[in-house]
């Protein structure tokens, strides 16, 4: 029997501790819904600016959104963006998950000031190890060349552009 964490089982939380969703209950010939979110951002002229993909089940969408925010709004490189700490809010349960630091994976983690502030405004917080999501990214630079980056959370992950 094969196992897929993408299917939901009634009254059983998934690998991330999230409640099951009826749309993903196991049924004959059923395919699970997916959070897969390969993303392409284009320049106004239609050429590719960013190509990005992520793995991580329920946490994919928040990883993609954070990567785009870091690159588009904060002007980070793809490698800098992928190395940033991540947070995830599934809405149910009512908890925001923050990555903690990992020197081995070259991830800083969220600082105590950020998480203390969230807690002070009534947010339930929890900490997770880096690596619950991983991603790869490609970005076209202004001179027409590309930068590619692999997630430091994955052992031997890298990007290479010619």
Predicted features, each with a name:
Residues 1-44, 74, 78:
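Active-site rim segments in enzyme catalytic domains, especially the processed small/beta chain
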Residues 1-6, 68, 154-162:
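Extended active-site and interfacial segments that coordinate phosphate-rich ligands
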Residues 71-121, 125:
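Compact, glycine/acidic-enriched structural inserts
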Residues 53-76:
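Alpha-helical support elements that line or immediately flank enzyme active sites
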Residues 109-162:
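In a subset of proteins, long, contiguous C-terminal domains/tails are tracked
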Residues 40, 64, 81, 138:
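Hydrophobic, well-ordered secondary-structure elements that form the walls
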């Amino acid at each position: 029997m094969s196992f897929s964490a993408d299917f939901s089982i009634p009254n059983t939380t998934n690998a991330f501790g999230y409640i099951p969703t009826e749309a993903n209950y196991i049924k004959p010939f059923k395919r699970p819904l997916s959070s897969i979110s390969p993303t392409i951002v284009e320049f106004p002229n239609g050429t590719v600016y960013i190509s990005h993909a992520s793995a991580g089940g329920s946490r994919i969408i928040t990883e993609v959104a954070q990567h785009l925010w870091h690159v588009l709004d904060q002007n980070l490189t793809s490698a800098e963006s992928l190395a940033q700490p991540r947070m995830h809010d599934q809405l149910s349960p009512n908890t925001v998950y923050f990555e903690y630091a990992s020197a081995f994976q070259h991830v800083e983690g969220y600082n105590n000031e950020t998480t203390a502030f969230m807690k002070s405004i009534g947010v339930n917080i929890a900490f997770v190890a880096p690596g619950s999501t991983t991603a790869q990214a490609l970005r076209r630079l202004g001179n027409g060349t590309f930068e590619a980056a692999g997630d430091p959370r994955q052992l031997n992950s890298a990007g290479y552009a010619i």
